[in-house]
């Protein structure tokens, strides 16, 4: 018996408004009623029902395509969302309904199977873009903090075995294009054209489908870790400790000592635990922006250039080496970062565990008050990371101490490569 070949559908390289006779459900971003706002339909099971550009899972959408191509995933599979609801319900908060406060995540992304239940009955395949669960963190630095007496187990948040109990929230990026354009102070049409061109023409609908105002970009999202009662995070009387952290795989995971990323991340976690144990709450938001969003290959090229340059690895050339290779010092653009804090309902941060002027300025600019800024203790800065910390202090990062002068910046402090 011969196996019947699947018949491929005609491929449309692009689409146009009304081209297939279907009228997508409009998305009225910022509407307080989910029915009026409308669902984000980014699935591929029925293309006529889609009302966004792009698809779910961020950068992992490509792996989904590979799974379909390999024959291990049915392209018509729909998710069974039984027992997947958030273990803790967040919001709705006033920021959810302000089209200028949240532009890069779907406020209703965690509860789509509740608030859009009627659409499921009509055959719409709607996927969550936010998931909320519980987790235990087990990090050697927390064990050390307990041994040295900086933290004390309480049997609830921090256990005797060193495990820390947290609420964990994963966000996929969902961009409201008019709002993103406003954040970057460009015309929406210009943003659409440049996104299309600079991704190699990956999403022609950015140009042809001006009726679709939501884009699911193929990039990483972020994860929030909440310490203490998650229901207290948004309350005005709660003393809140926050660290916003951008991914650094080499340091965060493997302990590379050329930067302060893991030490500062762990310091932030310790401060969050301490704050929550004192009756407040703590929040760590971890963004996938490897190498200042320049990527890890670029980052490693910069490391090589720094170590091999004439005069050695020194702070005065720290940013210049990045700019020579990447054409820019930093592409993280913290303007979208406050959205996760707004989703949590945060209006004030009592202790902001960061020295970054970019992060501080973005949070304050978009309506969140910061009472106190907390720098990384000197003893936590690795020897090879002193180049980084000096360069950042000279560039305007927060400190209560002295800013390195030109003579100090010219000293080679970075480790030399051995032949």
Regions found by a protein language model. Give the residues of each.
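Catalytic domains of riboflavin
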Residues: 1-419
């Amino acid at each position: 018996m011969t196996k019947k070949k699947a018949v491929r559908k005609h491929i449309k390289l692009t689409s146009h408004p009304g081209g297939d006779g279907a009228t997508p459900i409009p998305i009225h971003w910022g509407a307080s009623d989910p029915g009026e706002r409308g669902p984000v339909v980014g699935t591929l099971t029925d293309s006529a029902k889609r009302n966004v550009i792009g698809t779910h899972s961020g950068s992992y959408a490509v792996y989904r395509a590979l799974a379909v191509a390999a024959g291990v995933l049915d392209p018509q599979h729909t998710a069974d969302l039984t027992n997947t609801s958030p273990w803790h319900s967040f919001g709705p908060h006033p920021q959810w309904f302000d089209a200028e406060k949240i532009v890069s995540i779907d406020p209703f992304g965690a509860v789509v199977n509740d608030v859009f239940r009627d659409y499921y009955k009509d055959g719409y395949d709607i996927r969550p873009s936010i998931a909320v669960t519980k987790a235990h963190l087990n990090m050697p630095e927390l064990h050390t903090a307990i041994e040295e007496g900086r933290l004390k187990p309480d049997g609830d948040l921090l256990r005797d075995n060193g495990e820390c109990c947290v609420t964990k929230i994963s966000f996929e990026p969902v961009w409201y294009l008019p709002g993103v354009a406003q954040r970057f102070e460009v015309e929406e049409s210009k943003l659409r054209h440049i996104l299309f061109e600079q991704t190699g023409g990956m999403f022609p609908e950015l140009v042809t489908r001006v009726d679709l105002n939501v884009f699911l970009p193929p990039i990483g999202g972020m994860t929030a870790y909440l310490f203490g009662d998650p229901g207290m995070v948004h309350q005005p009387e709660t003393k809140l400790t926050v660290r916003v952290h951008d991914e650094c795989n080499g340091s965060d995971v493997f302990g590379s000592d050329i930067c302060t990323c893991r030490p500062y991340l762990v310091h932030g976690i310790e401060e969050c635990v301490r704050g929550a144990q004192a009756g407040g709450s703590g929040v760590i938001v971890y963004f996938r922006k490897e190498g200042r969003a320049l990527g890890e290959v670029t980052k490693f090229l910069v490391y090589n250039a720094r170590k091999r340059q004439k005069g050695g690895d020194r702070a005065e050339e720290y940013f210049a080496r990045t700019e020579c290779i990447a054409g820019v010092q930093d592409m993280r653009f913290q303007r979208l970062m406050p959205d996760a804090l707004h989703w949590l309902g945060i209006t004030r941060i009592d202790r902001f565990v960061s020295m970054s002027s970019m992060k501080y300025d973005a949070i304050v600019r978009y309506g969140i008050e910061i009472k106190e800024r907390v720098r990384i203790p000197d003893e936590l800065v690795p020897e090879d990371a002193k180049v980084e910390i000096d360069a950042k202090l000279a560039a305007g990062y927060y400190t209560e101490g002295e800013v390195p002068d030109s003579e100090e910046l010219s000293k080679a402090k970075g480790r030399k490569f051995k032949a």
